């Protein structure tokens, strides 16, 4: 399909720079194909679901993946900004760096805050390899838990570029950009639909008879990358690591066999569930990378409803929601959201999308 079909104009004023408080006070647009759009709030979610529905959240935890440093021996040069995007092993990370042209293979970068170092010593990394578009492979002097601790001490919250370009990240973001479910460290971007949940909403869902399940997909920085090719078939999707336990898969399959719907909280949960789905719609345990790219024409096998934020034009995520509800339906929904003052992107409002039962 032509990428331009997924383009739309979004006023800069629609981009949320802070979340609302409390989190479940965010607005939520309910989209049912063939039905009138409903303007609701996230706290209405229990009333919009049915007893027996299965809510699936992503429990990944965002790491402090934004590092600042300088090349050793080049103190007068501009600082090096590195965003860790993918763990390769116990001591190596793939990263996006700026300015990448300043780095060569073999260079050593010392990371810290204005020359300070973490308690474990200097956090140094050697540039092992350079790729396209600012990608490098960094080999750190620390390994395993020691490296994780050093990154946590020296790093900052890796806010999306559409927020970080408008304001400086601060300590509040360390809390705001983490879901209440965050448990397994490894993401460099938040599963943003989960940001809307509160203990009160969780309790109300349980009282409604909705069961909550957890999976893990470590969201990568590729989630922010626009589709630059003219045809979606030519786009190469980024890979992310995810796991679904056998117990979770069995519980979801049993509930669905009894008529319960699977409701994915976020596109990350949906992508992992669909990656693990068999042809008959049952879900298998999963522990692997997924690079699933969902565009209109995709046959959904596992997910019946999706709660998700509002996404970027020409993004793989807007393509995904267009596949879920139909391109024309989502174009109309986004026009309504923009005209009605909904807040977009990571800190913005939510949508609750239902697909046609016949396509189950």
Curated annotation (Swiss-Prot):
Keywords: Cytoplasm, Queuosine biosynthesis, S-adenosyl-L-methionine, Transferase
Pathway note: tRNA modification; tRNA-queuosine biosynthesis
Segments crossing the lipid bilayer: none
Key word ATP-binding present: no
Catalytic reaction(s) noted: 7-aminomethyl-7-carbaguanosine(34) in tRNA + S-adenosyl-L-methionine = epoxyqueuosine(34) in tRNA + adenine + L-methionine + 2 H(+)
GO terms of molecular function: S-adenosylmethionine:tRNA ribosyltransferase-isomerase activity
Highest rank taxon of the organism: Bacteria
UniProt-listed Pfam families: Queuosine_synth (PF02547)
InterPro entries found in the cross-reference section: QueA (IPR003699), QueA_dom1 (IPR042118), QueA_dom2 (IPR042119), QueA_sf (IPR036100)
Any one Gene Ontology BP term: queuosine biosynthetic process
Enzyme class: transferase
Cellular localization per UniProt: Cytoplasm
EC number: 2.4.99.17
Gene3D superfamilies: QueA-like (3.40.1780.10)
GO CC terms, sorted: cytoplasm
Family of the protein in this entry: Belongs to the QueA family.
Function of the molecule: Transfers and isomerizes the ribose moiety from AdoMet to the 7-aminomethyl group of 7-deazaguanine (preQ1-tRNA) to give epoxyqueuosine (oQ-tRNA).
PANTHER family on file: S-ADENOSYLMETHIONINE:TRNA RIBOSYLTRANSFERASE-ISOMERASE
Subunit structure: Monomer.
UniProt protein name: S-adenosylmethionine:tRNA ribosyltransferase-isomerase
């Amino acid at each position: 399909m032509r990428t331009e079909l997924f383009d739309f104009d979004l006023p800069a004023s629609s981009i949320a720079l802070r979340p609302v408080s409390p989190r479940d006070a965010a607005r939520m647009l309910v989209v049912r194909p063939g039905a009138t759009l409903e303007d609701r709030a996230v706290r209405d979610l229990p009333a919009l679901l049915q007893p027996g529905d299965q809510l699936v959240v992503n429990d990944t935890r965002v790491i402090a993946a934004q590092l600042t440093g300088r090349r050793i021996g080049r103190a007068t040069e501009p600082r090096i900004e590195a965003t860790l995007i993918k763990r390769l092993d116990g001591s190596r990370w793939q990263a996006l760096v700026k300015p990448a042209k300043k780095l060569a293979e073999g260079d050593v970068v010392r990371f810290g805050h204005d020359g300070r170092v973490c308690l474990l010593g200097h956090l140094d990394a050697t540039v092992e390899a350079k790729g396209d578009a600012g990608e490098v492979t960094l080999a750190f002097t620390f390994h395993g838990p020691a490296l994780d601790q050093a990154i946590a001490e020296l790093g900052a919250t890796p806010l999306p570029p559409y927020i970080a370009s408008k304001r400086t990240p601060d300590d509040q973001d360390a809390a705001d950009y983490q879901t209440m479910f965050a448990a397994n460290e490894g993401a460099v971007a938040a599963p943003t639909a989960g940001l809307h949940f509160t203990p009160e909403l969780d309790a109300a869902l349980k009282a409604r008879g909705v069961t909550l399940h957890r999976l893990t997909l470590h969201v990568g920085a590729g989630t922010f990358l626009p589709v630059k090719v003219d045809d979606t078939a030519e786009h190469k999707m980024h890979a992310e690591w995810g796991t679904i336990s056998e117990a979770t898969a069995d519980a979801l399959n049993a509930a669905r066999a009894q008529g319960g719907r699977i409701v994915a909280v976020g596109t990350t949960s949906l992508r992992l569930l669909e990656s693990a789905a068999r042809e008959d719609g049952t879900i298998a345990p999963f522990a692997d990378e997924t690079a699933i790219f969902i565009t209109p024409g995709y046959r959904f096998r596992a997910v019946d409803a999706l709660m998700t934020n509002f996404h970027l034009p020409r993004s793989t995520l807007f393509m995904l929601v267009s596949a879920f509800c139909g391109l024309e339906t989502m174009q109309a929904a986004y026009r309504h959201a923009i005209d009605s003052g909904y807040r977009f992107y990571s800190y913005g409002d939510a949508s609750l999308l239902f697909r046609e039962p016949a396509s189950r």
